[in-house]
Amino acid sequence: MLFFYNLKEFLKAFTLLSLVFAFILSLYSVLDVLLLYKTANLRIIPEAMLTTVLVSFYYTAPIINNLSLMLYLKRVFSKSYDKIASTFGISPLRFFAPILIFSLFLSLIQFALSYSFYPYIFKTAYSLEREFRKGKPQEELLLNDLWLSLNNAYIRIGFADLRNKKVHDILLVSLEEGYITELITAEEGYWEGENLRLKNAQINLFEKELQKQADVSIKFIPLEEAKAFGEKLNHLSMGRLISLYFLAGKIGMNRELYLAELLRRLVVSFSNVVILSPMLLALVRERAFLKPSTFLLIYGSIYIFSLNSVKIAAEEFGKNPLIGLVPFLVLSFICARSLYYLSKG
């Protein structure tokens, strides 16, 4: 009975704040469409509102969850329900178990939705902005200065427009026992299946001391996989990220980028429970809201810093993004410690 009462009261607070949050964002979205979009088409307003709310909720759910906790505890503390429960030997962990279970459930739901649902929402929001706000009807699938290793060869593509399958400024260097055996350069070419077709390529075969000019076909990777490399990472499903992680390793690309995006989704999803647990302990101990509010700012900052540090480690330094995960792991340790103290009362 106590379990369902606490769950009901917390869900009231969570629903109220979520609705307020959604209303403010919806209003912002409508004004954004009417005032800033080049094509103020009224039919896109519902879609723009929905994508804005969902994209924002994805990142701010941990904050809404903790604000809901504070709103819920205001009622609990005013009635001293937790103190009454403690006289019957009920620990804070047991008393607040419904809130912790809900937060864990919310984390799991967010993580499951980040497999393909949220990437679809991010892509839709991006497409709407490009088409109606910036007047660009299609997503650009461009690759610049791309270096790949394939078997015993290195391929450089200066520029590729994956929408029309064209590539420009191509260089291929074949090696054998550390020596260059073949050098192929071409100004332009195009993708055909798993092959790159190069027009009027300059071919140098050093072992045979032969130089010639001809059209060449190079076995490469399928265009669809190349398109994935040109897409924004948050538009890719988790399954695609995992496959690209292994593929990038085989062809010499920076595969850490794809691991970083997976870790970012993990951080966003499980921050719902990781931040709430130490906040709950601080609120129960203080039975006030000023000092715990400071903790919320600190934990929220660690959350944002973790998202950025994971990305920077992979993108800027080409390092394993697990290095950037350290702040979140520290926060996770604080979460586990908080649960222990809550169980002890």
Task: Show which residues each predicted segment covers.
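Membrane-interface helix/helix-cap signal primarily in integral membrane proteins
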Residues: 203-219
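Short, non-transmembrane cytosolic segments of multipass membrane proteins
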Residues: 58, 215-235
